[in-house]
């Protein structure tokens, strides 16, 4: 990464972290993927039960492999029914996620189809750890919503066998298709419980 962009990301991340702290959430800056994994593991005690909500960013930095290789109870939802997976996630010690977008003052936006991810962010798991690439930082809530709807959601639709206009056109049509992956919008602007939500900002382009 260009050194000037790296410096810009570090400065911007500090502003985001200040915003998160003002919202009863914790923020961290990781200069690269390896530092992000190290920071995440410091937040996850050994022996913890860990669930995840389709977080490609956690895979990209190597965190999932580190958890599978370590002394953790990683809940593999691929081996469970949807209902079993959801109940296990609600009861997990740690829930891993990313954000579709985050504002420069620490507000996160997430869109979900089945809503398992946004429901676990809102309540249930004892701790939520976000892995967020600096490419997802937006100037304000309006920009964050636009990114979530017109960048993250159309890209996410490519992963599934769905028939939505965003999948074929690459932008949001505010559709009401039976296949829509945008059933729930979650704006996380404050955490009721201190030390529950932790956001690791990674100096990289991650996720969708």
Task: Please place each PLM-identified region on the residue numbering.
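Short, flexible active-site loop motifs that bind/organize anionic cofactors or intermediates
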Residues: 3, 25-27, 134
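Conserved phosphate- and dinucleotide-binding cores of soluble alpha/beta proteins
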Residues: 90-208
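Glycine- and acidic-residue-enriched helix-capping/strand-helix junction motifs
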Residues: 1-9
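N-terminal active-site beta-alpha-beta segment that forms phosphate/nucleotide-binding
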Residues: 9-96
